[in-house]
């Protein structure tokens, strides 16, 4: 498979340029200031303090590697189902071209429940972070594979200045070193290689020795069964970002409950 990540990043840069022409920074700042914030990190910590897994449940229609995951896709219904069945937070795909996501999906999901929401997208510019705040996101994702360290630090500082939480995502040990220069307590280990889309949960287990005690590991991708959850919890990984396994189920929230509770 060709290098998907490079293609996505190129598209994102074009999208940012177009968005800046259509919605000037000052207009976006006005929208952002009108939005309330929910405590993303606090919601995860509360689950862990109660001895429960902290699940970031994903609202995702499709992916480049798997195609359409869910034909009947109603973000508000999915969000309510997740909230009812014990999710700590939501993750909503807003990328249109590769994941068939939408800003509207994030707005609808957030309005349907009280859970904090992560904007799941490929952030390459501070403008997208202000966009995230304006659409109602409570957290953003920074992907180490897509950013150099100085830019990642700059984007994190801007997100924090807006009150947004940051989940930094890594896939290998070099990226982990990069991520640990940030201030965020949330370190996502993506079991899927974004350059090949190959997936193994061993990726998380192999990097745990690098993570300081003051960081929370979120294992991402490839968590498909109760056995996968048990493997992670036995290794003291208690925060999860899961999408595909729930999206393929008749009722996403019930699938979450079966897998985690």
Swiss-Prot record:
Q: Which GO terms describe its biological process?
A: L-tryptophan biosynthetic process
Which CDD domains does the annotation name?
IGPS (cd00331)
According to the UniProt record, what class of enzyme is this?
lyase
Q: Does the keyword Lyase apply?
A: yes
InterPro entries attached here? Aldolase_TIM, Indole-3-glycerol_P_synth, Indole-3-glycerol_P_synth_dom, Indole-3-GlycerolPSynthase_CS, RibuloseP-bd_barrel
Query: What Pfam families is this protein classified in?
Result: IGPS
Question: What are the record keywords, sorted?
Answer: Amino-acid biosynthesis, Aromatic amino acid biosynthesis, Decarboxylase, Lyase, Tryptophan biosynthesis
Which terms in the Gene Ontology molecular function aspect does this entry carry?
A: indole-3-glycerol-phosphate synthase activity; phosphoribosylanthranilate isomerase activity
EC number(s): the record gives: 4.1.1.48
Kindly state which reaction or reactions the protein catalyses: 1-(2-carboxyphenylamino)-1-deoxy-D-ribulose 5-phosphate + H(+) = (1S,2R)-1-C-(indol-3-yl)glycerol 3-phosphate + CO2 + H2O
Q: In which pathway does it act?
A: Amino-acid biosynthesis; L-tryptophan biosynthesis; L-tryptophan from chorismate: step 4/5
Please give the HAMAP family that the UniProt record associates with this protein. Answer: IGPS_B
Q: According to its UniProt record, which protein family does this protein belong to? A: Belongs to the TrpC family.
Which protein are we looking at? Indole-3-glycerol phosphate synthase
